[in-house]
Amino acid sequence: MDRGRRFVSYRAIEEAWLDDILATMEDGVGCFMVEAAWVLRHYLERHPEHANALRGYAQAGRFELLGSGENIIDVNMVHGELMARNLILGTLWGEHVLGVRPTTGWHGDGFGSSAQMPQVLRECGYQWIPAISYSHPDAPYWRGLDGATVLFNIPERFTETSGSHASCFRKHPPCPACQGHGCAICQDRGFDPNRAELDNPPMARTAAAAIVCGLWGEEILPGERVTAAIAALNATNGELHFRHGVYRDLYPFLAQELAQVDAPPAELVSSRVENNPTQCGCWVSRIRCKQEHRKTEHLVLAAEVWDTLLNAGAQADTLRTLWKTLTFSAFHDAITATHIDAAHEELMDLLGAVQHTATQLLSDACTRHVDHAITSVTLFNHHAFPSSAPVTVTVPGDWAGARVTAGDMALPVFETLNDGEVTLVTFAAPSVPGLGATTVTLSPAPARQTPVHDHTITHAGYTIDAGEHGITRIAVEELGAVVDGRDFLFGELVLEVDEGDPWGTRTYNHDRERCAPFTTLTGIEALGDSVVLRYAGAHPVNFQPFSLNAKITYLDWTQNFILRTGIPWLEVETTVGWYTQDYRLRLAFPSATRANRGVYEIPYGVLERDRYEATGTHLGAANGDWPAIHWAGIQTPGYTFAVFNQGTPSYRVEDGTVLVSVLRSPVAPCCLLEPASYVAHNYYGMMDNGTHTFHHALYLGAGDWRDNAVVRQAAIFNCGLTVVPGALSSSLPEWKLQAAHTLLSTIKPAEDGRGIVVRLVEHAGRPEIVRLRVPATLTSAVTANLLEDPLVPLTRDGDDLLVPMGAWKIVTVRIA
């Protein structure tokens, strides 16, 4: 309640919109479109009585479900599998419910678009996408990373205009008669509607073959007098003929463009494979949205693989629901943080619920193959390549230290923590086979914890110089010095002025303050087979409580730099107490280069991008960062300098330093406070005040990123091994992938329930033929598109399926 007014879910507006649409459709000529399957599905769950009418309208060409998928999601911060699954699930659901497969792609209001979107669109049957936001292809055809091409927007021989004077962004204020409680005047809805009537029509013929007149906008209800307005215009306007329509009606006029979509003239192809950057603040604001979403995605992926392989896909329906729910977390006003506090809390609850369910499904599948054993655990590897990673296990009892073995092999043990009742043991897993499992045994041992007094540390292949205020130099065996402190110390916190809103930075003032002078080395210690360097610091304002600093209230931090035997990366754990306004916090990872070109992992691919500076101060202007998923870094002549992240996707490569943005504190409530419609001060959470913890790692891969293990290691860093109490009791089904640079995206039951689907992605831009070994009971294998329509039978070589992988291709294999 706000001054006697009432707030309701946005779903109430969606329901009113669809109710009104269906009422106007009864005139026999009205047409309408819905952007996303999510909206329509939830409406039909509440109103199944309208399903037949909607199906009839769709088949009559009067209703079109557009091809954004389940939701219009952000496609820069999500796993490639979610980018694909969003469109797959929305398209198949639309076809099932409406009897018509959606064919018009849609990404309206999405904040940028990724380089593998054209391939995903084409694999789902879409050749045309008339809406992309807010950065666009610079030519009519958009060709993606793999060469797949789609037609963008409406060709020049058409004119597109708004046919309504209604504000596209005006919210629905409370009904003035009842202040939101519902009455006869507002049809018991509680709000004063904003409707899109046809009150701004074009009146004269132009050179265009057709004029597309849009009647839509955010939170705008359908007009009630559109059909009457069309009839009146046709009766009085001799130059133009008006009619209701949907995008499908334009396909006959697009025949020429669509006929050449696979081989358009070179001058008509956009010069860029992605439509970024834009709305850069969205990659940092409310950072927990990104962190928790990343964690949840990987949990669902692991659960799906093991439920399919070990539990015969028994939970396929539940997992499909989890994927659909994840598309809501990935929605372009959800993961992007462009929402109010209540919405943020709802999203955190949603992700927590998905994590809980996925964890239970994962445990249920894996425990089918283990026996109870108090001092043993089994490590399951859902990746298709051998994997080792730090693992933490809880054992009963109060252990001072621990010994961990895999067979006769002793494993590195890093830390043993206890509270008198249970002990947490962290150790390095052995190399667990891809899609396999290994049992390890734990037993008590003496504690191994000693302080280290030398400030030059050599451990796990790294040599580190620990200065009083930060790490000044890092060298690696066979590569030499890979970090220097010319501009920043390694992992240093950098405070940067960032005046703006959740969407982005709105000024050119990006002044920085280094935090190394306020940082102090607090200790170095050897914890078992690891070495931990500890630093802590605080901003000077913390010690001046009675001084006035309008922008920094309180800021402190601790950092642990962890070297682990058997683990190829240097971990950086940063905890920040953040109470600022109009600032951005970056972590600096300086290399030994002066590079301004970076390498960035994107959903289902990798791009090399150049440094750029801020492009403006308008809403959505880019501020100098690029989006990445698991890692970004610098390719040197001899090695890849990569910085892994766990849900902090905003990077900038500047004069040889990889800068990772981890926090923002925007103050401007753009689009979140709209007094003309309502007053609700429920947006202060956008400043992210509180304590935050971030996990990063430095990885050095010899040679080129296309050939070394950087992509695989970053995947392990984000989602390692599944730990299940007990010893392996039976062998796992034999699944094996032999590939140089092709990764497994998922293994899942087919959507139609007939067989198993394996999705692979080539991640280096180098074609190869991979070998896929499956259980002997599975005898049929064909490639398929993303919608799982069969394409080409696969050749066998002995026990292996031979799967051709084109450069950057996503290949789906159906096996039965």
Region annotations inferred by a language model:
Residues 34-38, 122, 131-146, 202-282, ...:
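C-terminal domain-boundary segment and adjacent tail
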Residues 25, 258-375, 720:
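Metal- or metallocofactor-binding catalytic centers and their adjacent structured scaffolds
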Residues 1-28, 167-169, 178, 186, ...:
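Terminal accessory/targeting
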Residues 98-138, 193, 226:
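Catalytic domains of cell-wall/extracellular-matrix polysaccharide-remodeling enzymes
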Residues 117-120, 136, 154-155, 167-179, ...:
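C-terminal (or distal) subdomains of carbohydrate-active enzymes
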Residues 49-68, 118-138, 142-151:
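Acidic, His- and aromatic-enriched active-site or binding-groove loops in soluble protein domains
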Residues 1-81, 85, 94, 123, ...:
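N-terminal catalytic cores of secreted or lumenal carbohydrate-active enzymes
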Residues 75-96, 158-171, 194-204:
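Alpha-helical scaffold elements lining the catalytic groove of polysaccharide deacetylases
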